[in-house]
């Protein structure tokens, strides 16, 4: 008796076909990225993150990192990291709820709540391994089908992904458009409302209208979640963040900060009313279902907070502010469009992917690492160089950047001057006019297939000749 395979198996592709199909699809996708100038390439640092580094075997000045205060290689933080590893070992051994929550984590959470929680009467902090995980937690644990999220159009990808996972209704308002946001809030009857915004927007460097956001949240009974990834440690008195810089307090606030940028280590945190944090401990999947970060990391962050809040932190912020103002001036010397940013993120919008990559390579030839930011990170047609400043930079570094940017800018001007005007680029090559005229004369002749026919009566002899040739 012949056995027939189950119908579910009969439809399976031949062995290996699924792998081949997937690889073909991915290879086509990679080729498309190459054709559009959109493939991203990793570079390998051979030394610690600093203004002057060795990358891919070359000495460079880096304008790519988010190490805004230049603390990533600070001796006090390196020593604290080593001390934490000696005390707690190299790993946490489990999730925060199953054995991985150490004294270093608990101490850091208390310190963070005291340092950046001045906006709340009852602040509590929750430490996460990454900023991405912190934003996912805030979006998913605090919302659901009953909620509406009102999101700035330029919010970070981690917030957007969290919104998608939350199952909440998401309404996007134009970037920093408070009138549009107010209209959306007026029309909403959602049980829970969350307004969500970056504080410093990572690709433009501008700062959200935080006072207006707080006022709208309070007026409409909404919560305001702010992601201060690029403000914590840099903005406000003692680097306490964007809310402290604007002197804002509200019971409606939820504050997210990261610890791998200005703080120079790794991780992130959420600060909110203690009830909000307790709920996140119970329900935030990106907190519950992952191994806790090594305690040594938390121990190093505690050392970082001391530097940030002290006299050295003030001096580093003052130097960074001076670098920012100098950079704003030098970017205006190029042919390109600088964004009006007063933060350490200084974008220079060039436009096309090809021109942006050419500018990046020109700077790289001078030993300067300034990354090209392209779609989908930024809208099509707004590809840019993003100059990220650090207190570890010197004014000599900026002088090198200025000279290289001017040369790159002039190089693009020369390349464009060497190209014919767009109206002429579609004209046929030299000599083609003759060909066109010939084509017109040819058009007046019978088709070539008819012109080559033999004289009447020659068909038989032609056929015979072909047969002889074939033989």
Swiss-Prot record:
Residues where substrate binds: 40, 156, 377
Reactions listed under catalytic activity: 6-carboxyhexanoyl-[ACP] + L-alanine + H(+) = (8S)-8-amino-7-oxononanoate + holo-[ACP] + CO2
Spans through the membrane: none
GO molecular function: 8-amino-7-oxononanoate synthase activity; pyridoxal phosphate binding
Listed Pfam families: Aminotran_1_2 (PF00155)
Region of interest: Disordered: 409-471
EC numbers on record: 2.3.1.47
InterPro entries per the UniProt record, alphabetical: Aminotransferase_I/II_large (IPR004839), AON_synthase_class-II (IPR050087), AONS_Archaea/Proteobacteria (IPR004723), AONS_Proteobacteria (IPR022834), PyrdxlP-dep_Trfase (IPR015424), PyrdxlP-dep_Trfase_major (IPR015421), PyrdxlP-dep_Trfase_small (IPR015422)
Keyword match Metal-binding: no
Enzyme class label: transferase
Residues annotated as binding pyridoxal 5'-phosphate: 131-132, 202, 230, 258
Requisite cofactors: pyridoxal 5'-phosphate
Keywords linked to the UniProt accession: Biotin biosynthesis, Pyridoxal phosphate, Transferase
Disulphide bonds in the chain: none
Biological process, per Gene Ontology: biotin biosynthetic process
Chain positions found as N6-(pyridoxal phosphate)lysine: 261
Physiological role: Catalyzes the decarboxylative condensation of pimeloyl-[acyl-carrier protein] and L-alanine to produce 8-amino-7-oxononanoate (AON), [acyl-carrier protein], and carbon dioxide.
Subunit and partners: Homodimer.
Protein name (database record): 8-amino-7-oxononanoate synthase
Originating species: Burkholderia ambifaria (strain ATCC BAA-244 / DSM 16087 / CCUG 44356 / LMG 19182 / AMMD) (Burkholderia cepacia (strain AMMD))
Taxonomic path: Bacteria, Pseudomonadati, Pseudomonadota, Betaproteobacteria, Burkholderiales
């Amino acid at each position: 008796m012949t056995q027939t395979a189950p119908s579910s198996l009969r439809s399976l592709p031949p062995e290996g076909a699924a792998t081949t199909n997937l690889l073909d699809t991915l290879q086509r996708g990679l080729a498309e990225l190459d054709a559009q100038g959109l493939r991203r390439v990793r570079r390998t640092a051979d030394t610690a993150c600093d203004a002057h580094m060795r990358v891919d075997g070359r000495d460079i000045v880096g304008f790519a990192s988010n190490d805004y205060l230049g603390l990533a290689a600070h001796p006090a933080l390196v020593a604290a990291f080593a001390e934490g590893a000696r005390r707690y070992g190299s790993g946490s051994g489990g999730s925060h709820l199953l054995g991985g929550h150490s004294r270093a984590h608990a101490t850091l959470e208390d310190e963070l709540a005291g340092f950046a929680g001045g906006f709340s009467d009852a602040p509590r902090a929750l430490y996460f391994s990454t900023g991405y995980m912190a934003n996912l937690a805030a979006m998913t644990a605090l919302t659901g089908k009953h909620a509406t999220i009102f999101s700035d159009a330029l919010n970070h990808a981690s917030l957007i992904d969290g919104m998608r996972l939350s199952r909440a209704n998401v309404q996007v308002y134009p970037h920093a458009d408070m009138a549009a946001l107010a209209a959306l809030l007026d029309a909403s009857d959602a049980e829970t409302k969350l307004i969500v915004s970056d504080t410093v927007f990572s690709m433009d460097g501008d700062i959200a209208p935080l006072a207006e956001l707080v006022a709208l949240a309070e007026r409409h009974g909404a919560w305001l979640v702010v992601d201060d990834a690029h403000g914590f440690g840099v903005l406000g008195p003692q680097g306490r963040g964007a809310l402290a810089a604007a002197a804002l307090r509200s019971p409606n606030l939820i504050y997210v900060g990261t610890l791998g940028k200005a703080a120079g280590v790794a991780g992130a945190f959420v600060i909110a009313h203690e009830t909000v944090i307790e709920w996140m401990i119970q329900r935030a999947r990106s907190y519950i279902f992952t191994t806790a970060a090594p305690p040594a990391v938390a121990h190093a962050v505690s050392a970082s907070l001391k530097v940030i809040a002290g006299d050295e932190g003030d001096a580093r912020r003052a130097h960074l502010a001076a670098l920012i103002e100098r950079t704003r001036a030098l970017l205006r010397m190029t042919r390109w469009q600088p964004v009006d940013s007063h933060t350490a993120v200084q974008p220079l919008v060039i436009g096309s992917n090809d021109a942006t990559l050419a500018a990046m390579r020109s700077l790289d030839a001078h030993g300067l690492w300034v990354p090209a930011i392209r779609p989908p990170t930024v809208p099509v047609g707004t590809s840019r160089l993003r100059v990220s400043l650090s207190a570890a930079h010197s004014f000599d570094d900026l002088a090198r950047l200025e000279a290289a940017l001017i040369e790159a800018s002039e190089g693009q001007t020369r390349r464009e001057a060497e190209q014919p005007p767009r109206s002429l680029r579609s004209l046929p090559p030299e000599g083609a006019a003759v060909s066109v005229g010939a084509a017109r004369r040819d058009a007046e002749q019978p088709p070539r297939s008819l012109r080559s026919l033999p004289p009447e009566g020659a068909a038989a002899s032609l056929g015979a000749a072909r047969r002889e040739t074939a033989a």
